[in-house]
A protein has these predicted regions:
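Class I SAM-dependent methyltransferase Rossmann-like catalytic core
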Residues: 1-42
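Class I SAM-dependent methyltransferase SAM/SAH-binding core
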Residues: 46-48, 53-105
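A short acidic, Gly/Pro-enriched loop at the edge of an enzyme's catalytic core
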Residues: 104-116
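A short glycine-rich, Lys/Arg-flanked "PGG" loop and its adjoining helix->strand segment in the class I
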Residues: 129-140
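Substrate-binding/catalytic lobe of Class I Rossmann-like enzymes that use SAM or dcSAM, i.e.
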Residues: 176-288
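Core SAM-dependent methyltransferase catalytic element
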Residues: 286, 295-315
Length: 315
C-alpha cells in the first residue's frame, strides 16, 4: 500500500526521485532578500533553517558567511529522510542537515538561535505548532524570515498546470494495476488463457498511455515510468515476476510522490488571511512581526510571501 497521506513519506520518497522541482532563488527574485537578511548576522551567529528541503536557504547562509569572512553555526532540519549524498555535501559547506525532524516538535532548547528562517517549507508543517516552535527557537534580539508560497504565485499556477497535464495523461485506466495483476498471476501460476488476456489488456493500456503522453511529452515527469511500462509490456514473460512487481511498486511510488508533492503545494499556498493568522501566532509568542511583503520574480510575477520578525532585545 502506498502511504500517500503521510507528509513525511511524500517528501522522503520525493527525494529518492532522479528529478526534482527546484524553487530557484535567483530566478524568483529571492537572492537579494536572503542576502540582506543573512548578511546582518554577526560572526558566530547560530542559525536554524526549518523544513530545509534541498537546503537552498541553508546553503545561501553558508555562502554569505564565506563571502563575508564570517562563521555561522547553521542547523537545517526537515521532516523527510534526506538523501545521504545531500547531507554530506551540505556538511562540507558547514551546514548540519538533519532529517526526520518535525518542525512542529523541535528537539532544541528555547532561545537557542540568533536566526530562524525557512524558504517554501514551514507552511507545509502543522499549524500553528510549527510557527510557535519557530518562535520558541529565537533568542532575545534574534531575527527571522519566512519565504512562503503565495496562492497567486507563478509557482502555484505552474503546479496547477502540471497537475492538469498529469491527470490528462494518466487518464481513466490504471496501467500499474493491470501490470500488478499480470505479474501476480505469473507468480501464482495463472492459466495460459488468463495470462494471454491479461497481457493483451496490459499492452493495450500502455499503448493508450503512450498516445496520451505524446511527443514532446505532455508530462515529462511520467517519461521514466512510461518507458519502464513499455519495456515490460513488449514481452512480459521474459521478466522475473517478483522482480517486476518490486520495480512496479518503485515506479508507481515515483509517480505518486511527484503528484502528491504538487498537490501539497496547492494545499499550503497562502492568502492574506493566512498571513494574518501566522502573524498572530508569532506575536502571541512575544515576537514583533512586520507586515507581509509580496516578492516578485525577475518577470514581475508574484513569487512568494516574505514575512520578517524579531524578538525584542532584553532591556
Amino acid at each position: 500500500m502506498i502511504r500517500g497521506q503521510d507528509p513525511a513519506w511524500i517528501w522522503s520518497r520525493y527525494w529518492l526521485r532522479d528529478q526534482h522541482d527546484e524553487c530557484l532563488t535567483d530566478a524568483l527574485g529571492l537572492a537579494g532578500l536572503w542576502r540582506d537578511y543573512l548578511s546582518a548576522f554577526d560572526d558566530g551567529a547560530r542559525l536554524l533553517d526549518l523544513a530545509t528541503g534541498s537546503g537552498e536557504a541553508a546553503e545561501a547562509a553558508a555562502d554569505t558567511a564565506r563571502k563575508l569572512h564570517r562563521r555561522f553555526d547553521i542547523d537545517a532540519i526537515d521532516s523527510a529522510s534526506l538523501p545521504e549524498d545531500l547531507v554530506k555535501r551540505m556538511r562540507k559547506l558547514g551546514v548540519r542537515m538533519m532529517g526526520d525532524i518535525d518542525a512542529a516538535a523541535l528537539p532544541f532548547e528555547d532561545g537557542g538561535y540568533d536566526g530562524v528562517f525557512s524558504q517554501f517549507g514551514i507552511e507545509y508543517a502543522a499549524r500553528p505548532q510549527a510557527f510557535l516552535e519557530a518562535a520558541r527557537m529565537l533568542r532575545a534580539g534574534g531575527r527571522g524570515l519566512f519565504v512562503m508560497h503565495h496562492r497567486e504565485s507563478v509557482i502555484t499556477r505552474t503546479c496547477a498546470m502540471r497537475l492538469a497535464s498529469h491527470r490528462n495523461v494518466i487518464g481513466p485506466t490504471d496501467c500499474f494495476a493491470s501490470a500488478r495483476k499480470l505479474f501476480t498471476s505469473y507468480l501464482l501460476g495463472g492459466s495460459p488463457t488468463f495470462l494471454q488476456q491479461a497481457e493483451t489488456s496490459f499492452r493495450n493500456e500502455v499503448a493508450m498511455l503512450r498516445v496520451r503522453l505524446g511527443e514532446p511529452p505532455a508530462d515529462p515527469n511520467l517519461v521514466p515510468a512510461v518507458r519502464f511500462l513499455t519495456e515490460i509490456a513488449v514481452a512480459p514473460s521474459r521478466f522475473d515476476p517478483a522482480d517486476a512487481l518490486k520495480r512496479l511498486k518503485f515506479a508507481q511510488e515515483d509517480v505518486q510522490s511527484w503528484r502528491l508533492r504538487q498537490e501539497a503545494q496547492q494545499a499550503v499556498a497562502l492568502d492574506a488571511p493566512d498571513l494574518d493568522a501566522i502573524r498572530g501566532w508569532l506575536a502571541q509568542e512575544g515576537l514583533d512581526v512586520a507586515p507581509p511583503e509580496i516578492v516578485r520574480d525577475n518577470n514581475g510575477d508574484i513569487a512568494a510571501w516574505a514575512l520578517r520578525f524579531h524578538r525584542p532585545a532584553l532591556a
